[in-house]
Amino acid sequence: FPKLERTTNPDGKRVYKTPSGAAYPSVTTVTGLHTAKGIAEWRARVGNEEANRISSRASARGTRIHSLCESYLRGESAEPDIFDAEMFSSIKFLLNDIDNIHALEDPLYSDHLQVAGTVDCIAEFQGKLSVIDFKTSSRPKDRDDIHNYFMQTSAYAVAFEERTGIPVGRM
């Protein structure tokens, strides 16, 4: 996949420049618009200091687990520290169901949707081509909580099909 130039617009949002010169907002920015209100309400409820502490800790854990998943799928050493070992071991069996990787941390863009970003993984999961996005959470979520995840993975499925001609059937 071609590299995309990644910049930040004046509002601090990620923008990707495609090989044709088009500038598209990130998939995460676009799908995050639906959760901004909920995050603002949560921040008001717990207070900014506590929200910053929780967000920072969750973001760091998510980055570490994401890196472990990527390394594991590349066949590289993936040794979690003591803090991440339990979470990583709870998802490792799912990683073993991933095969025939088409994209792993690769840039994708859609001229049709006018969005771009870096997809976590597109591969066969249990035998079906899937967009796989590594998420971490300290609590179970129901479908209403993850609507934006479906939008995000759907956008990557469209972008992947535009770039390769291969449809992705599972998100």
Which stretches of residues belong to each language-model region?
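Mg2+/Mn2+-dependent nuclease catalytic core
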Residues: 103-171
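Metal-dependent nuclease catalytic cores that hydrolyze phosphodiester bonds in DNA/RNA
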Residues: 1-116
